[in-house]
Design a protein with these regions (language model features):
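A short, histidine- and acid-enriched strand-loop-helix "catalytic/donor-clamping" loop
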Residues: 111, 126-143, 153-156
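Donor nucleotide-sugar binding/catalytic pocket of nucleotide-sugar-dependent glycosyltransferases
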Residues: 152-202, 209
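Conserved donor-binding/catalytic core segment of Leloir-type glycosyltransferases
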Residues: 202-224, 230-233
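Nucleotide-activated donor-binding/catalytic signature segment of Leloir-type glycosyltransferases, i.e.
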Residues: 248, 255-276
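Conserved acidic donor-binding segment of nucleotide-sugar-dependent glycosyltransferases
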Residues: 275, 330-342, 350-357
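Acidic donor-binding loop of glycosyltransferase active sites
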Residues: 284-297, 310-311
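Short hydrophobic beta-strand element within catalytic cores of glycosyltransferases
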Residues: 311-320
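A charged, aromatic-enriched C-terminal amphipathic alpha-helix characteristic of glycosyltransferases
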Residues: 354-387
């Protein structure tokens, strides 16, 4: 009994001390850019930690978040391009400042991150964590060597998915230093929008038919391989199965896709909706569709579709996928077709609709997947648990 009481007191004391350590911990987040879509998680980090933020100054035409939403100190540094690499000016001196832990974007092409990781080994009681895609499964021998050196310099890595974590464990990384954090969008806004949504006949009115409705949300670009959807629809039509397709977005492939739709006699079944920046309007379009089709890399499109209750189909070659493919649960929140195989895409679309399903139950499963694993609240709990 005495031993039990002593152990219990020690355990309670350790929990208390850990809470004190976390309360007093000074964190610094160093990122390549303050992407607008990451606003929610950056705000939560700001609320839950004593954190300063250091962001790179440019990332093409990607929208930047509003720095005034963060109460912690925010500093913008110049991302100096060096061929295919880059260097963040002013980052190295942060090692000498009063921070206990650092979170850095884990990009091997960032030279300043390499130097930062190496120099951190000379600073006692400072920990550097990386936030990264980690492993894809398509790395060359040289890339594997470089990545192993890079990630093993850190004290831990926050990964977007379990797929990357399993690959890294197979490469010899310590599983206790690999943390799956997933990804997130503007979840609170999407949730508020979702609560207002209800089934409508928007597609029946536009198309004048009762066909199942396919949808794609994103830029109409080459990498999305959207021509595959049109060819698959044509093959389905030859077999007596007709579908509607709504393309929400714009891009350099629009005219080419319009021409292809005409050639395949699908103009009455394809709606080039254009870009949509109103979340309520966009949410309604996704919510009332039956299946989101993303033949290329699915990425954030999967999260956007699932949060509003629509399942997703994409290709099954995971080394070329983005981590969000993990939100697709076979037969529940979507399905996969063979990479770059139009016949397989055709078959999978037909199979999805020929299998008896309760649309409302599918909707709930899609929403549940996002609600449980792909929110800033899930991410902040992973950070709080592992930044110790």
């Amino acid at each position: 009994m005495l031993v039990w009481m002593m152990w219990k007191r020690w355990f309670i004391r350790e929990i208390y001390l850990e809470e004190i350590r976390q309360m007093n911990m000074k964190l610094c987040l160093i990122y390549n850019y303050a992407q607008h879509y990451r606003t929610s998680i950056f705000k939560l980090i700001d609320q839950e930690f004593d954190c300063d933020f250091v962001f790179g100054d440019s990332m093409g035409d990607v929208k930047k978040m509003d720095y005034t939403l963060l109460k912690g100190n925010v500093k913008e540094v110049h991302n100096k391009k060096l061929g295919g690499a880059y260097f963040q000016k002013g980052v190295l001196k942060l090692l000498g400042q009063k921070y206990d832990k650092y979170i850095m974007l884990g990009e091997t092409r960032c030279i300043s991150t390499w130097i930062f990781l190496l120099l951190s080994k000379f600073y006692k009681n400072k920990n550097v964590y990386l936030w990264s895609h980690g492993w894809y499964g398509k790395e060359t021998k040289f890339e594997r060597i470089i990545k192993k050196m890079f990630f093993k310099l850190s004290d831990g890595t926050f990964l977007y998915g379990n797929y990357a974590r399993e690959l890294m464990i197979k490469e010899g990384f310590n599983k206790d230093r690999l943390f799956v954090i997933h990804n997130s969008l503007a979840y609170d806004k999407q949730l508020a929008t979702r609560k207002q949504l209800k089934p409508t006949d928007i597609y029946n009115i536009h198309y004048g038919n009762n066909n199942p409705n396919l949808v794609f949300v994103g830029r109409l670009t080459e990498v999305k391989k959207l021509d595959m959807i049109l060819h698959a629809m044509s093959k389905c039509k030859d077999k007596g199965e007709e579908y509607n397709l709504t393309l929400i977005g714009d891009g350099e492939k629009k005219e080419e896709l319009e021409k292809l739709a005409t050639e395949l006699n699908l103009t009455k079944n394809v709606w080039f909706y254009g870009p949509c920046y109103n979340e309520t309007e966009l949410g309604g379009l996704i919510y009332n569709a039956d299946l989101c089709v993303s033949p290329g890399n699915v990425g954030l499109t999967a999260m956007h579709s699932l949060v509003f209750g629509t399942p997703v189909i994409t290709h099954n070659y995971f080394p070329l996928q983005m981590p969000e493919f993990e939100s697709i649960r076979e037969g529940e929140t979507g399905t996969f077709f063979e990479h770059e195989n139009i016949d397989s895409l055709t078959q999978k679309i037909n199979e999805w609709f020929s299998t008896p399903r309760n649309r409302e139950e599918t909707r709930k499963m899609c929403m549940k997947e996002i609600d449980e694993y792909w929110t800033p609240y899930y991410q902040i709990e992973v950070l709080k648990k592992n930044l110790r």
